[in-house]
Amino acid sequence: MRVSKYLLSTQKETPANAEVISHQLMLRAGMIRRNASGLYSWLPSGLRVLRKVEAIVREEMNKAGAIEILMPLVQPADLWIETGRWEKFGPELLRFQDRHNRDFVLGPTHEEVITDLVRKEVSSYKQLPLSLYQIQTKFRDEVRPRFGVMRAREFLMKDAYSFHLDQGTMDETYQAMFTAYNNIFTRMGLAFRPVLADTGSIGGSLSHEFHVLANSGEDLIAYSTGSDYAANIEKAEAAIPTQSRLAPSQAMSTIDTPNAKTIAELVEQFDLSITSTVKTLIVKGATEEQPLIALVIRGDHELNEVKADKIDLVASPLEFASEAEIRAAIGAGPGSIGPVGLNIPVFIDHSVSVMSDFAAGANQDDKHFIGINWERDLPLATAADIRNVVEGEATPDGLGTYAMARGIEVGHIFQLGTNYSKAMNATVLDENGKSQVMLMGCYGVGVSRIVAAAIEQNHDDRGIMLPEALAPFTVGILPMNMHKSHRVADIAEKLYQDLNDAGIEVLLDDRKERPGVMFADMELIGLPHVVVIGDRNIDAGVFEYKNRRTGEKQDIPLDQIVDFLKSSLKA
C-alpha cells in the first residue's frame, strides 16, 4: 500500500477527551473516529488490525471444531421474555418497537437466539455435541461509555455456544475452548493470563476469564507464586486459617470513641493494631423475616461483594442497608456497629473466626468494645469466605502466596449448564427415546476490545508497538526525498514490489513530506519493521533498518534486505 493512495489520518495532538493511552493512540494514529458516545467508525489502519484479530480467532475456533454461523443483531423480545432476562437485564438492554408495535432488542449477547435456533434444528442425541460460533456486532447501552473501544456501546465480539447431552462432552469441549483461547492470545503475541472467574449474570458453574496484562487494567488478578492457580479478585479464594484461636488475655470493656467513625480513626486514636479490629457491615436480607444481615471482616480486609452475595440469607444482588434502616434495627449508626449482642443473623469471614481480644463497635453511638473473645462474649458466628484476598497470603492450594496484577478482560468461557436450555425447553431425544434438556457452554472473545488491550500493553512515548501478528502493516518503507532523487525512487519502488511479491504487508510512504513527519507517523501507527532509503545509504550500498520494538538500527546490504526481513519475520 502506498500512503498517497491510503487514508493515513494521523494527529499530532492528544485528544482532550481520551482518558486511557489506547484511546489516545487509536485516535492519533487514525484507527478510529468517534460518531457518538460509545460509537466509533473504524478507519483503514484500525480495520486492518481488527481483521487480523478476527482471522486468528476464526482460525482457532475452526481448529477447535466449532462451526461458524451468523445471527441477527436485532432480536425478538419474545425470546428474552421466555428466559426471564427481559426484566432482569436492566437498562443496558436497548429495547424498541418496529412499525407493527412488536418489541425487539439490540442484542448484547445471543444466548436466547442460539438456544432457539438449536432447539428447532437439533432433535437427536446423534447430532451432539455441537459447537457454533459467530463474529457479530453487539450493543449494550452503557450508562457511561469509557476508554474508546475498550468499553463502547457497540462492539464486535466472537461468541460461541456448545450443546451437549452429558457432562463428559461438556468438559471436553470446555477444555478444547480453553486451549483455543490460549492459542489465540499466544498467536497474537500478547502477555495474558487465564483466571478462574465468577459466572455473573450469565449464570452457570465453571468459568474462566482471559486477561491481557496491563498496568492500566481495570480488573485485579490474584495469582499464585508457586502454581498455576489464578483468579480474578472476585473469585480468588482465601485459604481457611490453620492456626488455632488464642486464649483470651483481657476482659471485654467499653471505650468512648466520639471521634472514631472509621477503623482508621479508631486505630490511630487508641493505638490499636488494625489486625485486632473488625468492621461490621449491614446488608439487606433475602427474606422479610430476616430483612438485615451482618457481615463481619477484619479491619484491614475488604468485603468481597460477589462472595457475600452467594450467602443464602443475603439478598441478591447485594445491597447495603441505609443508615436509617440500621438505626431502626440496631439503635446506632454504621460507624458504631459490632457483632456483640446483635439481634440479626451474623456471618463472619474465616479470618475473623480465629481472632481473640479484638475491638468492634458496641452498637451504641460513639462507643466500642475492646477485648472481645468468641464463645466468651458472644457465640461463634457462621464463618464463610467473604473478603478479598491480599498480596502475600497463602493460596488455597498451599503451593505459594498470592501476587497481584492488573488485567483487561478480553475473553470469558462458561459452563452454563441448563440455565437457558431448560427455560426455553431445548431438548433432544436420547438413545432410549427419552427427552433430555441439553447442557450448554458459552465462550466469548471481545474482538474489538482486544485491539485496545493490545495497545495498552504495547506502546511507548512515540506511539503504538503492536506485535507483528496484529500490526496494520509489517514493514514500512521511508524513502528520503524520493521526489528529488530518481535513485531513491527507483530502489524504493523495487523494494516495495519485492516485498509485495514475497507476501509481506508493506506501506510505502511516497508523500512529499519532511522526513521527521514520515518517521513520526510510522512510529505512531506502530509498524514493526522500518526500512529507510536515502542517497547516502545507496552510496554506501545499504538500507538502514530499524526495529520498532527494540529501537535497534542496522545497515543491511541492498541485495540482502528481503531475505533479512523474511528471516526477521520468521524469528
From Swiss-Prot:
CC per GO annotation: cytosol
Q: Which domain of life is it from?
A: Bacteria
Question: What Pfam families does this protein's entry cite?
Answer: HGTP_anticodon, tRNA-synt_2b, tRNA_edit
Tell where it localizes.
Cytoplasm
- The reaction(s) this protein catalyses: tRNA(Pro) + L-proline + ATP = L-prolyl-tRNA(Pro) + AMP + diphosphate
Print the keywords alphabetically.
Aminoacyl-tRNA synthetase, ATP-binding, Cytoplasm, Ligase, Nucleotide-binding, Protein biosynthesis
The UniProt record lists the EC number as 6.1.1.15
- Where does it mainly reside? cytoplasm
Q: Name one GO biological process term.
A: prolyl-tRNA aminoacylation
Q: What does this protein do?
A: Catalyzes the attachment of proline to tRNA(Pro) in a two-step reaction: proline is first activated by ATP to form Pro-AMP and then transferred to the acceptor end of tRNA(Pro). As ProRS can inadvertently accommodate and process non-cognate amino acids such as alanine and cysteine, to avoid such errors it has two additional distinct editing activities against alanine. One activity is designated as 'pretransfer' editing and involves the tRNA(Pro)-independent hydrolysis of activated Ala-AMP.
Subunit description? Homodimer.
Which family is annotated? Belongs to the class-II aminoacyl-tRNA synthetase family. ProS type 1 subfamily.
Domain commentary:
Consists of three domains: the N-terminal catalytic domain, the editing domain and the C-terminal anticodon-binding domain.
User: What protein name applies here?
Assistant: Proline--tRNA ligase
- The organism encoding this protein is Shewanella denitrificans (strain OS217 / ATCC BAA-1090 / DSM 15013)
